[in-house]
Amino acid sequence: MDVVEALGFNDPSKTGGSMLTYTLWTTPPNLGEPLNIIISNESDPRVLEETMLDGGLYNYLEAAAFGNQCFGLHMGDKQQANLGDGLTNQTQHTILRYQYFRNHFLGTCLESIYGGNHIRVWKQYSSGAYFLSSSAEEDSTDNHKLGLNAYDAGRDLFVGNATNIRVQGHLEANQTFVGEVSKRGWKYRTTVRYIEDLVPANRTNNHHTSVQAIGGYVSDGLVAVLTVQAQKDQPGLWSEEVSSALGL
């Protein structure tokens, strides 16, 4: 068993896939963005279910402050990914945006105005793991273009939100973080390990090379692998349900 299998996913490049998304209408063609976050199949089975109910994946992602786009309106092109699971290119399952103040009514609307983080989600059906592409974008006055270090910043902002730990500075391969977040009566304990040698650090086949600093790289080449455990939090309190209904 190699290190990737031990971490709970299959390396797409071993079976004809890629750790870069496929983005339409790029110049030159066929450029993509790094799949820089993986939710391991070693996670709690309920977290691997694509549902908001019963502690599922989308409840976890909202616990990390990521939700549906403002009023359900889609902004930006959809992307595809080939995860080497025999399905060739599959379209992203969803795109979720950062919820300012963790408010699930207006939080993503503020992200659309002021910029911030967003994630695209795919499932690798051969392993059951989820692959995410995360990047940080500028505000609406800059047409939401990606800024310097957008891929690494987006990845680390997501990890920070999922663990309640501030992730900053230069990261190393095998560096780990462990932390907890809660949502709708479920507590999630996330163990994060950064691994190398999955995505290219240079500009080869990377879209949005404007994120690359002069003399630097498009990305540090690290992927954050998350193993998420879930358990019932305090019994659902009436006050919690009211707060949730108010988007708090």
Question: In which residue ranges do the predicted regions lie?
Answer:
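Mature extracellular/extracytoplasmic regions of secreted and cell-surface glycoproteins
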Residues: 1-219
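Cleavable C-terminal sorting propeptides in eukaryotic secreted/cell-surface proteins
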Residues: 219-248
